[in-house]
Regions:
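RNA pseudouridine synthases
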Residues: 1-217
Length: 217
């Protein structure tokens, strides 16, 4: 078990830069116990037993806030429920996205025949909303294939929301580079999705907190 890239810490909260490939919380099985929560508890033994208030997919990198105290956990959880926490992501999408900006609204749910994939279902699915803006088209990799750099602002927090909104034909129709579930990524490829801004109200001081951390791609 390794350490953490700590962006900010005080007596109430900690903000970390989660690397791609690391779980946010423990999963089932001995091989899924190394995660952000486990590392926080190892470094700070006096913190809550369950400090997590939100998650990033294992394949997604970026900013994650956790609570050290029960009061901070309760306050941050309420902020997430009321959608008072604002997050923005940057991603590289396969190919050239023709439009410059827009809003995606799609309903989806677990695909029981192909977990952990989600599938589009406007009847039984939960609706997710994402605002997006094209940053630029750029060459990527050794072959210099064209990809589109996109900023995402999810207004809801559904599982795989940005990945499905990117890949599905009713969304952008361009999977995120490196996506093994919804795109053409291989088992060794990195998902090019990074949570680069995080805004919330400090649970103890009431101060507006804003963190920005650019991706490494």
């Amino acid at each position: 078990m390794l350490g953490l890239d700590i962006v900010y810490r005080d007596d109430s909260i900690i903000v970390v830069n989660k690397p791609a490939g690391l779980l946010s919380v423990p999963g089932r099985g001995d091989d899924k116990q190394d995660c952000v929560v486990a590392r926080v508890k190892r470094l700070f033994p006096d913190c809550l037993d369950q400090p997590s208030v939100h998650r990033l997919d294992m394949d997604t990198s970026g900013l994650l806030v956790l609570a050290f105290t029960q009061e901070a956990h309760r306050d941050l959880s309420i902020q997430f429920i009321k959608r008072q926490v604002h997050k923005r992501y940057v991603a590289l999408l396969e190919g050239v996205v023709p439009k410059d900006s827009g809003q995606i609204e799609l309903a989806f749910r677990y695909d029981p025949d192909n977990r952990p994939r989600q599938k589009y279902d406007p009847v039984l699915g939960k609706w997710g909303t994402t605002v997006w803006q094209k940053i630029r088209v750029e060459p990527f990799g050794e072959d210099k294939v064209l990809v589109t750099r996109i900023q995402f602002e999810p207004l809801t927090g559904r599982t795989h929301q940005l990945r499905l909104h990117s890949a599905h034909e009713k969304g952008l129709g361009h999977p995120i580079v490196g996506d093994r579930l919804y795109g053409s990524g291989s088992e060794t490829s990195r998902l090019m999705l990074h949570a680069y801004t995080l805004q919330f109200t400090h649970p103890s001081t009431g101060q507006a907190m804003r963190f920005t951390l650019d991706p490494d791609f």
